[in-house]
Amino acid sequence: MTVRAALALGLDSAGGLGRQVAATARKLTLQPLAPYSAAAIRIGLGGLYLIHLLRESVRADRLWGPGSPFTADLFDQTLKARGWDGAFSWWYSLLVTDSALVFWAWYALAVVLSALLMLGWRTRVVAVLFWFLVVAFYVRGSMANSGWALLSLLFANYLVFVASGRHWSLDARRRARRAEEGKAARSKFVFWGEETEELRRRLVTILHNGGMAMIALQVMVIYGSAAMYKIQGESWRNGTALYYTMMYDDFSTFPELSAWVASHGTFAALMAYVTVFSQMLFPALVFNRRLKYCILVVMLATHIGIGVLMALPMFSAITIVGDLVFLPTTFWLAASRLVRTARAAPEEKPEASLPPPREGADGQAKGAEVGSSA
């Protein structure tokens, strides 16, 4: 091969790669990625936060309200120490009040917004308001926050940019009803041409895809960093980490079950190694079309085990919600068809089978028919 031929081949390869990159970039501006996963994340996040607020309502005053030991003076000192006493200090101090009425008004609003986000009513506006209050609750309870609180804050942050109301929402039902009635969707702005509308659609798609990419990246960072921290610990390297965890009373939901797991050392060691390797390999395996479901099932089992055996149900649930970002649209469509089939099966009644006519009666009927024709 001559130098000229090699250069021509290289230019052709570079041109093909450039065209492929351009086509991918164009697709990312035209096609929203994983819209059903976005809807599932919206439902999961809104539902979990609603459960969280309702469950903690009996302790809300001590956690975030006027009765909290984290008083207003201590809160202000903490803001200054962390450098948060800037332009957004009013936002962070939203729940810092001596009035029980004001606090419970914000609390009730948070409950309502969580329910509306889960149902998908005016999703764009509600997602922003929901995120606004989640930040306020997180900062107010910064001395007692957990992994669940941090992940809910991060996902609420990313969900602001995601078009999560296109499926399984009241917004989607309203649009479908308008389409059935033949009412075309009109722009809310007076001077809004076709080119501007196309630009708006592409910008919305870019923001949606960016938000979903950030959720996926966040989940991979969580698993990757968790694996890196685990392998630095001696108990994880020798397989005894789960044994000591099961023997810790603060993380024992069912003491008998925890004792059974701890009594089977080989099983506990195997589960410890599976946990480390699955978290370490997750970022690579989750993009393989065939191995994706295997690693997601392993992570699902891991989270269920954490929620049941370690008394961390909310943390396990929010991590499962984050894993939903990796499920493709084909999975959700197949699941929807399966649900519709399961719902329609009990409603279908078997048709009543008519008994076959007797031979004598059939012969009499034929004779009568012949006689009438004669």
State each model region's role.
Residues M1-A374:
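Alpha-helical membrane-anchoring segments
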